[in-house]
Amino acid sequence: RKTTPGLRELEKYAVRMGGGTNHRMTLTDGALIKDNHIAAAGSVTEAINRVKKEFPGVEIEVEVDNLEQLKEALQAGVDIVLLDNMNIEQTKAAVEIAKNSKTKLESSGGLKIENAAAYAATGVHYLAVGALTHSAPVLDIGLDF
């Protein structure tokens, strides 16, 4: 997501060369349950259970936007929880809630290069900083003869 069409592999390579990591290349690497999926299923738990039933063994990541949804996702046993648009204090609380779980936490939404260190300090496992790919400065080059 949020990469230039046709350039995803190169952009993700650039992130790795800059010291970042990619925990997925495409959405086919696992199931990503977003807010619309949760709404359609009726609950976080139901959305997770449907994916587990249809795609046993697939890595499941679920997007949550509050701590109650986080607790529900942890109870349902997902691999990764994406904390969407949570501020630093909410993120710290999420890390505390999940501290005894094997589930990984990813902060996303509102992260910028300038505040990434503060989010990293909360103890989350992953930071989704979209600006690394969708807002990277362009290189002005020309082929003048």
Predicted regions and their residues:
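Acidic/glycine-rich phosphate/pyrophosphate-binding loops and surrounding catalytic core
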Residues: R1-A76, I80, K92-I97, K102-E106, ...
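Active-site loop ensemble at the mouth of alpha/beta enzyme cores that anchors a bound cofactor
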Residues: G142-F145
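Short secondary-structure boundary segments
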Residues: N85, G109, A131
